[in-house]
UniProtKB/Swiss-Prot annotation:
GO molecular function: arginyl-tRNA--protein transferase activity; leucyl-tRNA--protein transferase activity
Keywords: Acyltransferase, Cytoplasm, Transferase
Similarity field: Belongs to the R-transferase family. Bpt subfamily.
Protein name in UniProt: Aspartate/glutamate leucyltransferase
Gene: bpt
GO process terms (BP): ubiquitin-dependent protein catabolic process via the N-end rule pathway
GO cellular component: cytoplasm
Record-listed E.C. numbers: 2.3.2.29
Keyword Transferase attributed: yes
Amino acid sequence: MTQHSRDTPQFYLTAPSPCPYLPGRHERKVFTHLVGNKAGELNDLLTHGGFRRSQSIAYRPACDQCRSCVSVRVIANEFRASRNQRKILARNADIVGEQRNPVPTSEQYSVFRAYLDQRHRHGGMADMTVLDYAMMVEDSHVETRIIEYRKRTLDTGITGRGGDLVAAALTDVLNDGLSMVYSFYEPGEQNRSLGTFMILDHIARARRLGLPYVYLGYWIEGSKKMDYKGRYLPQQRLAPSGWIRVDASGEYPEPQD
């Protein structure tokens, strides 16, 4: 029997299952394990090719008769916030983002649990326990951070620490950008539009780090759950011919390297 190296990726295909985004359709995924010394390099390469990471697994849709899931990445240096997005930034001027190592806490899980119960109670993650959450955060062989968003306090300017946790984002640092793996927020703060705010904050962070892109995962036209990702322009969308730029007018110029 041939023994495969841990650094040599092996790809697998899942059986069909109901699509969680488009009613009446079925999904399949191709996936591989991100392990070994080259896990970071492989994650970079696969993300550029439209894969997403979940713990130590990299996956992408491989549906038989559907190509609706389109990988998108925001062009950070060219992004200009819309009027509504600027209002959201102003509304959250009292929020401080703190980058941390991927260490799960009970405070994070409390917000995560409330988020699932309010926003995704019938979703595939609805039954996640505190141990499941810990695995989601810790089980990474690539450069991963968790960014906590807290309310500013009187001592924040001195200590650099915020107060109550209102949101968090699990984020991979790639060679050409930031990849938002999963984000969640306190549902009682829904008037803040914290999901949008975290994306805007990641775009600003990518700029400061000199990274060209923020990877948002899959945009699905016609899906209420995923259509919002098309609002961050200009962006690039992965087509069979490569990454295609989409500007503010919705036009599709030449492929991008």
